Amino acid sequence: MQYIVVTGGVISGLGKGTITSSIGHILKDSGFKVSSVKIDPYINYDAGTMNPYQHGEVFVLDDGSEVDLDLGNYERFMDINLSWKNNITTGKVYLEVIEKERHGDYLGKTVQIIPHITDEIKRRIRDVATSSKADFVLIEVGGTVGDIESMPFLEAVRQLKREENNVIFAHVTLVPEIGPTEEQKTKPTQHSVKALREIGIQPDIIFARSKNRLLEETKKRISLFTDVPEGGIISVYDVENVYLLPEVMVNEGFISYLSKLSGKEIKYRDSWKAYTENIKHPKDRVKIAIVGKYVDLHDAYISHKEAFSHVTGNTGIAVDIKWLDSEKVKDDQSMLSDVDAILIPGGFGYRGVEGKIAATRFALENHIPFLGICLGFQVAVIEIARDIIGLQNANSTEFDPATKYPVIDILPEQKGIKDLGGTMRLGSKKVLIKDGTLAKRIYGTDTIYERHRHRYEVNPNYISIIEKAGFVFSGTDEDGIRMEILEKKGDESFIATQYHSEFKSRPLNPSRVHLHLVQQALIYKKNKDIGEAVKLRSSV
């Protein structure tokens, strides 16, 4: 078993997570069993209560863990399912150590960063290695070398190499290109590696992030000042889509160099070849609006963005996302007039909800393909109740506790719960699909398992009323009590789900509802183009 530790220097946001994921994909595609660990140096226990503007999307695993979005990248690139063990935070580590101290596990010793905190970090890393039985365990250390929050984790992985001698260190740095000649500057990388060496870590590989491919002269200079052989300086230049990165790394000689370091023969099968060709050379394009309240930070909805990439890779239909602030859509639905489909993603809180309801109404009135996810499912129910059934001011008790028509209400088991972290209906749940429905045609089966993250549900008192209005709840939980899928009778282009199908979308197995939305968007676009052509001819 081999550990590969990925650290980052110079600045944050260089793409450590994507590089780690790409390493994992290359190894998995070469026949190795892989697992991964994301170390987040924040004191939060997990990502569950974080504002998306602070940290991007909260990703949900099968076991209900609310984790950093990088674990979503790991699952997608490596096609594996992870658990709570794969996300280590300062909060988890310190809480465990403090609880052990309270239990008397340290026998009266003074509890310190070294050895108690570092030992707990190593224990958690080794637990992943043991339980996964992986050939390679990838460890991404969040933050930037030099950050005070990361120091205990860097010390722990330094000790790990000293104790086991099966650790490869990979360091991600920035090579800026300055001036009109775009001269590649190596000084930031030199200083970053120097800072890493000062804490006892010598990188074995350097992933140099840059706008353009590294010049050979640049590689030689980095090698001279870092003691990393030129073959270990891997140029990671900008690509139009993250799924093209493994191909770049392979072409830059990463496989042969890693084979030498690990002593293992790595034979890459390139199972994504057709997939990446579709991404590079799509044959059609559609425009889909994502209407949310965190659209200024696209990472808040990264799993939807990636799900559309997966559809492109499998169909050759490229998706141009139009990011729309739901608060602005509330007052101006004309923003939606040029799109081929509308997606309403999940979310919490009242802000922006009326805009999402307005977008749903616009889709229904104009027969635009529609997909609602989680809160998007709930606002679809609210819109149907208000404007089709006529229940004026129908709402969710989340937004209006005193509403006359509470078509969405809190889950019974959620009543009385005060804590926010880890208390929702979370993780993979069984969904039963009814025969003769659009959902059955989309999935081709009567049972699926999808990931959830919600506190509210369709009020059972309104189910029959909604279905009498021309809609059908085509999916339920395994008890048939909780509504999971909503569709419009006789309409192939309207569907909403309580679950988050984007969390299980993979490059070679895209989310079925995202795939369906894109296919419907293309039909809508072509019909619209035909209609416009007919109008043009008739006016001549």
From Swiss-Prot:
Sorted UniProt keywords: ATP-binding, Glutamine amidotransferase, Ligase, Magnesium, Metal-binding, Nucleotide-binding, Pyrimidine biosynthesis
Region named Amidoligase domain: 1-264
Domain of life: Archaea
GO function terms (MF aspect): ATP binding; CTP synthase activity; glutaminase activity; identical protein binding; metal ion binding
Binding residue positions for UTP: S12, K185, T186, K187, P188, T189, Q190, R221
Family statement: Belongs to the CTP synthase family.
Protein name: CTP synthase
Organism, as annotated: Thermoplasma volcanium (strain ATCC 51530 / DSM 4299 / JCM 9571 / NBRC 15438 / GSS1)
